[in-house]
C-alpha cells in the first residue's frame, strides 16, 4: 500500500499543497504554505480556498491541455493580468479584492535547460552504448572469422600431411616391388646360366650367392628355441641311457602311506593338521616315485637294486620327518584345550580359560574354548566358494557372504574346507 496522496474533487492528485501525517490510526494534513494541521481533506480544501485564495477548477477552464509546457502557467498569466487590473483600480481610490488562483508549480528556464541537458546526455549515452554494442559485435564476428580461417588452415595442413604420408607409403611399396623384381631377375639369370652344364650344388650355390636372406629372431623366440634344443638333447640322452638292456628291473619302493606319515606326528595333533599331513604325504609319494624312477635308470647296469631302493627310502624318510615336525602343532598355536586350562571358580563351577598369551577369556564349555583358540592360530579353514577369501571362523564367513555376495545360508553349509 502506497503513501496516501491528496485528491481533489475532479480526481486530480496534488503533491505540492499539503502532506499527509500518520500516527497510529489517526492522520492529519499539514499545509505547505502555513504549516497548519487539518484533520480531513474537506477541511484542508476549505482552508486553502479561504486562507490562500485557491480557486479549485479555475485553471482547468482557462488554459488548454495540449499547450502545457509548464504546470498551471495559464493560472500565473491570468493572475498577473488580474493584478494589473487591481493596481489600476487602487490608483482610482477604490480598493477591490480579486481572487487569484495560486499556481502549483512553474518550471524556470534553468530547470528547463537542465532537463534538456539531461535528455541530451541520456540520448548521447544511449547512442554510445549502441556504438559499443556494434563494435563488440563486429569484434566477435572478426574473431569468429579468424577462428574459422585458422581451423580451415589446420584442416588443409592435415590433409596435405596425410597426402604426403600416402605418397611416401606408395613410393616405398613401389621401391620394394622393384627390388623384388630385380632379385627375381637375378635369380632367373643365375638359374639359366647354371642349368646348361652345372650340377645341383653349383646351382644352389649360385642362387645362394645371388639372394641373401636374413632371418632375425626376437629374444623370446631365441629363448624358446634354446629350450627346445635343450629338451631334445635331454630326451636323446634319456633314450640312450635306456638302450642298456635290463633283465629284471626292480619294482619301485612302496610309497609311504598316510598312516606312516602320521606316525611321525605327536598324539595331540588336530584334525586340520592331519588333513594337511595327508596332502603332504601324497606330494612326498609323487616325489619319491619320480626320484626312484630317476635313480634307478643309471643304476640298472649295477648289482644290488634292492639296496638302492632301501637307500632311496632312507633319503626320503628324513625330509618327510622334518616336514612332519614342522607341521606338528606348537604349544602356543594349538587349537586344542590343554588340561591346565580348566579352572574351578569359588562357587564350584568349572571354567575353561584360554591360556594363549595374555588372552585369559573364560568359557563354560570346552568346545567353545576350542573354537575360540582358532582365532589365535594362523589356520583359515573356512573358504568362500565365490572368491578367494578365507576365514578362521564360520561367523566371519557368513558375514562376508551376506555383505559381499548377498548370500544367506544355514550353518551346515559353512563347513571348513579341509582338502
Swiss-Prot record:
- Is the keyword Cell cycle in the record? no
Q: Which domain of life is it from?
A: Eukaryota
Zinc finger motifs (C2H2-type), residue ranges: 29-52, 352-376, 382-405
Q: Name one GO molecular function term.
A: DNA binding
Extract the ranges annotated as region (Disordered).
121-179
Q: What is this protein called?
A: AT-rich binding protein
UniProt-listed Gene3D superfamilies: Classic Zinc Finger
Subcellular localization(s) per the UniProt record: Nucleus
The record's InterPro entries line, in alphabetical order, gives:
Zinc_finger (IPR050331), Znf_C2H2_sf (IPR036236), Znf_C2H2_type (IPR013087)
Disulfide connectivity?
Answer: none
One GO term of the cellular component aspect? Answer: nucleus
User: In terms of one coarse class, where is the protein primarily found?
Assistant: nucleus
Low complexity bias: where?
Answer: 126-149, 156-173
Offer one example of a GO biological process linked to this entry: regulation of transcription by RNA polymerase II
Explain the purpose of this protein.
May be a transcription factor for genes having (A+T) stretches in their promoter and/or enhancer regions. Binds to AT rich DNA.
Q: Which UniProt keywords apply?
A: DNA-binding, Metal-binding, Nucleus, Repeat, Transcription, Transcription regulation, Zinc, Zinc-finger
Amino acid at each position: 500500500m502506497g503513501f496516501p496522496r491528496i485528491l481533489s474533487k475532479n480526481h486530480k492528485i496534488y503533491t505540492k499543497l499539503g502532506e499527509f501525517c500518520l500516527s497510529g490510526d489517526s492522520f492529519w494534513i499539514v499545509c505547505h504554505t502555513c504549516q497548519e494541521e487539518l484533520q480531513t481533506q474537506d477541511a484542508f480544501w476549505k482552508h486553502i480556498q479561504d486562507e490562500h485564495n485557491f480557486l479549485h477548477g479555475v485553471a482547468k477552464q482557462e488554459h488548454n491541455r495540449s499547450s502545457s509546457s509548464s504546470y498551471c502557467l495559464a493560472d500565473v498569466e491570468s493572475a498577473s493580468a488580474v493584478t494589473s487590473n487591481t493596481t489600476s483600480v487602487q490608483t482610482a481610490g477604490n480598493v477591490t479584492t480579486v481572487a487569484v488562483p495560486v499556481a502549483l508549480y512553474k518550471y524556470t528556464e534553468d530547470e528547463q535547460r537542465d532537463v534538456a541537458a539531461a535528455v541530451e546526455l541520456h540520448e548521447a549515452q544511449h547512442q554510445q552504448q549502441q556504438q559499443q554494442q556494434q563494435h563488440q559485435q563486429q569484434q566477435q564476428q572478426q574473431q569468429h572469422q579468424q577462428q574459422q580461417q585458422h581451423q580451415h588452415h589446420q584442416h588443409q595442413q592435415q590433409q596435405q600431411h596425410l597426402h604426403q604420408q600416402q605418397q611416401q607409403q606408395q613410393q616405398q611399396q613401389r621401391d620394394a616391388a622393384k627390388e623384388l623384381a630385380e632379385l627375381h631377375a637375378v635369380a632367373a639369370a643365375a638359374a639359366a646360366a647354371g642349368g646348361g652344364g652345372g650340377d645341383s650344388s653349383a646351382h644352389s650355390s649360385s642362387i645362394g650367392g645371388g639372394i641373401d636372406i636374413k632371418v632375425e629372431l626376437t629374444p623370446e623366440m631365441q629363448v624358446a628355441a634354446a629350450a627346445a634344443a635343450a629338451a631334445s638333447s635331454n630326451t636323446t640322452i634319456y633314450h640312450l641311457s635306456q638302450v642298456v638292456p635290463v633283465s629284471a628291473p626292480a619294482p619301485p619302493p612302496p610309497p609311504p602311506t598316510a598312516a606312516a606319515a602320521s606316525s611321525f606326528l605327536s598324539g595331540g595333533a588336530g584334525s586340520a593338521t592331519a588333513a594337511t599331513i595327508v596332502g603332504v604325504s601324497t606330494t612326498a609319494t609323487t616325489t619319491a616315485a619320480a626320484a626312484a624312477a630317476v635313480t634307478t635308470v643309471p643304476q640298472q647296469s649295477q648289482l644290488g637294486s634292492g639296496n638302492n631302493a632301501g637307500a632311496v627310502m632312507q633319503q626320503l624318510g628324513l625330509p618327510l620327518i622334518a616336514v612332519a615336525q614342522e607341521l606338528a602343532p606348537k604349544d602356543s598355536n594349538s587349537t586344542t584345550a590343554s588340561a591346565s586350562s580348566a579352572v574351578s571358580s569359588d562357587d564350584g563351577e568349572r571354567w575353561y580359560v584360554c591360556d594363549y598369551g595374555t588372552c585369559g577369556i573364560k568359557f563354560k564349555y570346552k568346545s567353545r574354548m576350542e573354537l575360540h583358540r582358532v582365532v589365535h592360530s594362523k589356520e583359515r579353514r573356512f573358504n568362500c566358494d565365490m572368491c578367494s577369501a578365507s576365514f578362521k571362523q564360520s561367523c566371519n564367513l557368513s558375514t562376508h557372504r551376506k555383505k559381499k555376495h548377498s548370500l544367506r545360508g544355514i550353518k551346515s553349509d559353512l563347513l571348513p574346507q579341509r582338502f
